[in-house]
């Protein structure tokens, strides 16, 4: 995790998988079902699609220090399928900044999946208290995508 000015954090997590890249891509871009397998994502609605540009409304919720914390974002995503890159940025939402990418790389024995996120909380949001949670969420999101791809691969 990289600590940037003004309460901004940049995080990255990666995993190697035997799952082929096309199947990981299929799972990542199954926008209307992400909330069925991504932990703490309570809603994911495809608002608009035009070519490789997608608008997605998402809501997440989780307990933090005994309190329920919820956040909503309207994301714009750009799909770069030949390169297996999915970039996203917040158009509107409960953060000052929320952007990043998912990247899939082909490997001889499968693939690697990289998730990068830059987030800046709203004024008054104790980013120091949630940064460990953010780090854990990145890893659990990667594992959830791989697990869903594995489930679909076996079907």
Predicted regions and their residues:
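Hydrophobic ligand-binding cavity/cleft-lining segments
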Residues: 1-53
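Mid-length scaffold segments of soluble, non-membrane domains
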Residues: 40, 49, 54-68
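A conserved amphipathic terminal alpha-helix motif
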Residues: 113-155
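Hydrophobic-ligand binding "helix-grip"
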Residues: 63-112, 118-120, 147-152
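Hydrophobic beta-strand positions in extracellular immunoglobulin-like domains
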Residues: 15-17, 60, 117-119
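Intrinsic-disorder/low-complexity, polar/charged segments enriched in Ser/Thr/Lys/Arg/Asp/Glu/Gln
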Residues: 8-16, 53-55, 72, 97-99, ...
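Short Pro/Gly-enriched beta-strand edge/turn motifs at strand-loop
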Residues: 25-28, 56-60, 82-88
